[in-house]
């Protein structure tokens, strides 16, 4: 089982991803096997700070322990989900994990600049790990 950490609780993706990985509160056809969220860190948010307390409570109800600092997850995880809605913080949020060779999924927006994106990929390459992002919005008609 792949142990995942989750960082920055300012988006509904935090709960949606956790429920699917933990097989809780969603239909069986939405379950995702092979990995579980084993620890989280709420982080902070300039965009949506008011959302964090509710998501912290939802994550706690799913049985996921919460740590105070992102670095506390190192050694407890095999991969990271960087969830902040603030693309401008993703480089610094991913850096400690990438430097330890921990693969990172970075939610949209991946970054707010080409320079940050290049730095993230360079960190991943230098530490022989993987980084990726994805968005279902590419398939929407608008």
Task: Locate the predicted segments by residue.
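N-terminal glycine-/serine-/threonine-rich beta1-alpha1-beta2 phosphate-ribose binding loop
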Residues: 1-100, 118-127
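Conserved Rossmann-like nucleotide-binding pocket used by diverse enzymes
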Residues: 5, 105-106
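Short, glycine/acidic-enriched loop or turn micro-motifs at the edges of active sites
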Residues: 11, 110-111
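Hydrophobic residues in well-ordered beta-strands that form the structural core
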Residues: 68, 106, 131-133
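Long amphipathic alpha-helical scaffold regions
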Residues: 100-102, 134
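Short helix/strand-capping hinge loops at secondary-structure junctions
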Residues: 101, 108-109
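A contiguous active-site-proximal alpha/beta segment in oxidoreductase catalytic domains
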Residues: 111-142
């Amino acid at each position: 089982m792949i142990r995942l950490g989750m960082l920055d609780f300012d988006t509904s993706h935090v709960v949606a991803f956790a429920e699917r990985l933990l097989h809780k509160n969603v239909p069986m056809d939405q379950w995702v096997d092979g990995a579980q969220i084993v620890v989280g860190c709420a982080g902070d948010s300039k965009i949506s700070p008011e959302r964090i307390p509710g998501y912290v409570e939802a994550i706690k109800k799913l049985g996921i322990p919460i740590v105070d600092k992102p670095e506390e997850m190192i050694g407890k995880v095999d991969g990271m989900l960087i969830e902040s809605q603030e693309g401008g913080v993703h480089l610094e949020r991913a850096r400690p994990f990438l430097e330890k060779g921990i693969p990172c999924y970075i939610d949209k927006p991946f970054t707010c600049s080409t320079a940050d994106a290049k730095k993230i990929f360079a960190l991943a390459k230098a530490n022989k790990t993987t980084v990726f992002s994805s968005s279902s919005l590419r398939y929407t008609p608008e």
